[in-house]
């Protein structure tokens, strides 16, 4: 049975943080340093999916820095405004272990983060096909702006969820 837990990122034990980072790194899109810093930022909530105490999926409700938000809004990236007032949070670090993909864990994690936003808007960026094509649209996120290439030459898309 899959159990879901929510933790404040600043209160997470080192072992849990390491497992969280490991799963995100398996997806390959985000530098470990950024994940560790992002999880420890004030207001960030970690969502964990566990089977028999083993973490098999993760996601986070993030509180993005203004410089990060401004970068995404720039014409070189999405070219779409994501104001702090309308979209105070970001859905991020969604990852599911390889052996449990296709079990609905990713969908449940995305929905849990939407619930944690408590009626506030969210944004997300992704290059992952399943996130772009089904998980985010299925949770009510809409693609906006233009796509752009990241440092690995993957095509990123900005999505917004309006409360």
Where are these regions (language model features)?
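Conserved acyl-donor/pantetheine-binding loop and adjacent beta-alpha core of acyl/acetyltransferases
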Residues: 48-50, 54-93, 101, 150-154
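Conserved GNAT acetyl-CoA-binding A-motif
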Residues: 115-129
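Short beta-strand-to-coil "C-cap" segments at the C-terminal boundary of structured domains/repeats
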Residues: 62, 160-163
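Conserved acetyl-CoA-binding loop-helix of GNAT-fold acetyltransferases
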Residues: 93-96, 102-115, 138
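Short hydrophobic/aromatic beta-strand or adjacent loop that forms the aromatic wall/cage
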Residues: 44, 153-159
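Short, flexible beta-strand-to-coil junctions
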Residues: 50-53, 126-129, 162-163
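Short amphipathic alpha-helix that is part of the acyltransferase structural core
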Residues: 1-37, 41, 46-56
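Conserved active-site alpha-helix within GNAT-family acetyltransferase domains
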Residues: 128-152
């Amino acid at each position: 049975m899959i159990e879901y837990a929510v933790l404040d990122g600043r209160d997470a034990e080192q072992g849990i943080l390491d497992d969280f980072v490991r799963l995100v790194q398996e997806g390959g899109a985000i530098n470990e340093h950024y994940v560790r810093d992002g999880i420890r930022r004030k207001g960030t909530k970690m969502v964990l999916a566990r089977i028999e105490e083993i973490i098999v999926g993760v996601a986070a409700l993030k509180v993005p820095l203004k410089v990060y938000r401004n970068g995404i809004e720039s014409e070189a990236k999405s070219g779409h405004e994501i104001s702090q007032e309308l979209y105070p949070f970001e859905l991020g670090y969604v990852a599911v272990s390889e052996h449990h993909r296709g079990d609905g864990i990713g969908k449940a994690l995305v929905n849990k983060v939407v619930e944690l936003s408590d009626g506030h808007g969210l944004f997300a960026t992704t290059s992952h096909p399943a996130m772009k094509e089904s998980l985010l649209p299925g949770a009510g996120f809409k693609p906006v702006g233009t796509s752009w290439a990241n440092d690995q030459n993957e095509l990123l898309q900005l999505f917004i969820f309006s409360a």
